[in-house]
Amino acid sequence: MAAARPARGPELPLLGLLLLLLLGDPGRGAASSGNATGPGPRSAGGSARRSAAVTGPPPPLSHCGRAAPCEPLRYNVCLGSVLPYGATSTLLAGDSDSQEEAHGKLVLWSGLRNAPRCWAVIQPLLCAVYMPKCENDRVELPSRTLCQATRGPCAIVERERGWPDFLRCTPDRFPEGCTNEVQNIKFNSSGQCEVPLVRTDNPKSWYEDVEGCGIQCQNPLFTEAEHQDMHSYIAAFGAVTGLCTLFTLATFVADWRNSNRYPAVILFYVNACFFVGSIGWLAQFMDGARREIVCRADGTMRLGEPTSNETLSCVIIFVIVYYALMAGVVWFVVLTYAWHTSFKALGTTYQPLSGKTSYFHLLTWSLPFVLTVAILAVAQVDGDSVSGICFVGYKNYRYRAGFVLAPIGLVLIVGGYFLIRGVMTLFSIKSNHPGLLSEKAASKINETMLRLGIFGFLAFGFVLITFSCHFYDFFNQAEWERSFRDYVLCQANVTIGLPTKQPIPDCEIKNRPSLLVEKINLFAMFGTGIAMSTWVWTKATLLIWRRTWCRLTGQSDDEPKRIKKSKMIAKAFSKRHELLQNPGQELSFSMHTVSHDGPVAGLAFDLNEPSADVSSAWAQHVTKMVARRGAILPQDISVTPVATPVPPEEQANLWLVEAEISPELQKRLGRKKKRRKRKKEVCPLAPPPELHPPAPAPSTIPRLPQLPRQKCLVAAGAWGAGDSCRQGAWTLVSNPFCPEPSPPQDPFLPSAPAPVAWAHGRRQGLGPIHSRTNLMDTELMDADSDF
């Protein structure tokens, strides 16, 4: 997110410094060649005086004076101040042979008035050199203190062109401890700063060596019309982004019970970050807020914030915009990681994100905080009038590259990796396991793959645009600085040309940043926020708002409710103790157990449950199913661990073997069952009455399901007193306790000796049921079972 950058270079010259250029390197060329630049012919005496001044002064009459011919003053005013004496000499001015020429040079030097602090200290020096007091053929020499006072405030003169030889603080021209008449003159020290510089007394606002002047608050590289155009652009896209992200947040909150699921809820936090960021961008449109944010109290641009003597409005806007942006991009990485891991766990009961959500929050909120504190510590927050905000690296693009481009580039690499892996996982599930997917699940996978592809394309495109715009700024910033420098010098020409009646040039900035590039850069930032909000632009969102409206207005919602079978079974098992006391009660399901799709409906896969519809017959038999699954057991039945043998002392060890019955075996068993039924109708075999077990007493406990009328798989084995269970040999036999004559033995069942029977009837030959697993095995082998 780059905004317009002012062309601030390390070498912006003083506006009035062009005076030195117009002088033709004043003092140097004149002193070395002996040629004057003033108008009119030079007298031989004037040339001799200049030559004497340069080659070496004659022996001084005293420590603070030098012999020189005096001439009456033709101009009794020097730089706007009246001189208290009436005679002067041109001996000390190495670039002037006459008073007229010296007066013209002073006019050119007056361009330094645009550097207020330099102008305040250089006026006495210039008057003491160009129009010194001369009395009795003796000229006063300026003191060394007067010369040294100009070196600091006027450092830009030394840096740009260098001081002339006759203005260098040498002991022969500027002796120590001398008083000068000029030092008693009161000069007008109220200098001014030429546009685009403004006057300021705050040293932190001074621009480089131009003490007393700072860059104006409004970016000088753009016109007022361009400022207004950019502000309207930011207002439009900022408002659209804010409204889209706000709608997303409201949709999540309206159905928070179903929306608060990972990974979909991560989109809530991403949109929250971009919503807060858009608020930071739109804050400038409050009355007077933009100037308060990007401008200092002295009218200069905010640079190097935070500072102790300025308000915190700039820092607050920076924290809002930058922290929200960095948190949003980190949440994007977490989102792609959550998608990747969730897609890998499809079709299983494994919850890959369980226990990791706290680490997600720790990472996404702490990392941007560290970056924000680091930027504030190095004081690299700058304001920009075009964008209307404060951000990092407007002045120094290296900090912008390190704190903006580097994190975004890392996000692009890591997030892109997880996003591509997630799409590949979905494609693998769809192509390698087509028979395991219901039509609804396959449709969701296709929709999600398409949306992830579009989303990834937009994310990569926006990041690429951001990088391109920033590189455009980096590579052209030096050229913009040179163009701005020429513009400043041109403005100085206008200032000097007015009093000297020289031609006035037409000043304009030749090379400057493109406003279109700045708009494209901002579009990438706002477009990312809009793209994040599109995940809730689904039909499920319309249903959420419909239910919310009905709830708020008290209207009835005629939408058919869907309750997942898994939720009904879980609730039935949770109420098994109540069903034990009252087997006839019916289960009621409140609206809180009704499951709706969240706003991000495309990410809710359920490969194991192709349909969520529940028939009335299925719902009525939930309690029966609970009993058949062993959740409700009679109080007189003992429950022991699975596969724990409890054989009677006088019988062989028998127990049911858990096994999976293939469909072919079930068909065979069904046919055998039918044959046994037909045989019973012809010749029923009644068991002896003495072998019947006693009738159970009346009880409210629901009856256990009847065991199937078919052969059971029994493991039989015998061992001696010294043998252990593991040393014995086990064989699978058919249950010999059925009264019917057994048909020919199946080839897949081995033969074994039959143990002694103890009962007759449908449950004859079976030992006591010792565990819930036995109940479930019995149910599994029942061909008439619905579950």
Curated annotation (Swiss-Prot):
Top-rank taxon, per record: Eukaryota
Span list, region Interaction with BBS5 and BBS7: 538-569
Stretches assigned to the Extracellular side: 28-233, 284-314, 380-402, 473-524
Record field: compositional bias (Basic residues): 668-680
Region (Interaction with DLG5): 581-593
One Pfam assignment: Frizzled
Impact when changing residue 412 to F: In CRJS; constitutive activation of the smoothened signaling pathway
SMART domains assigned: FRI, Frizzled
Glycosylated residues, chain numbering: 35, 188, 309
Span list, region Disordered: 30-60, 667-704
Disulphide linkage map: 64-178, 70-134, 78-127, 118-154, 147-169, 193-213, 217-295, 314-390, 490-507
Residue stretches making up the FZ domain: 65-181
Key words, A-Z: Cell membrane, Cell projection, Developmental protein, Disease variant, Disulfide bond, G-protein coupled receptor, Glycoprotein, Membrane, Phosphoprotein, Receptor, Signal, Transducer, Transmembrane, Transmembrane helix
Keyword Disulfide bond found: yes
One GO BP annotation of this record: positive regulation of multicellular organism growth
Subunit structure: Homodimer. Interacts (via C-terminus) with protein kinase A catalytic subunit PRKACA; interacts with free PRKACA subunits and the interaction leads to sequestration of PRKACA at the membrane, preventing PRKACA-mediated phosphorylation of GLI transcription factors. Interacts with ARRB2. Interacts with KIF7. Interacts with BBS5 and BBS7; the interactions are indicative for the association of SMO with the BBsome complex to facilitate ciliary localization of SMO. Interacts with DLG5 and SDCBP. Interacts with GAS8/DRC4.
Disease: Curry-Jones syndrome: A multisystem disorder characterized by patchy skin lesions, polysyndactyly, diverse cerebral malformations, unicoronal craniosynostosis, iris colobomas, microphthalmia, and intestinal malrotation with myofibromas or hamartomas.
Domain notes: The N-terminal extracellular domain mediates sterol-binding which is required for maximal activation of signaling. Contains a second sterol-binding site within the seven-transmembrane pocket which is also required for activation. The activating sterol is likely to be cholesterol. The extracellular site is required for SHH-induced activity while the site within the transmembrane pocket regulates basal signaling in the absence of SHH.
Its biological purpose: G protein-coupled receptor which associates with the patched protein (PTCH) to transduce hedgehog protein signaling. Binding of sonic hedgehog (SHH) to its receptor patched prevents inhibition of smoothened (SMO) by patched. When active, SMO binds to and sequesters protein kinase A catalytic subunit PRKACA at the cell membrane, preventing PRKACA-mediated phosphorylation of GLI transcription factors which releases the GLI proteins from PRKACA-mediated inhibition and allows for transcriptional activation of hedgehog pathway target genes.
Protein name: Protein smoothened
Gene: SMO
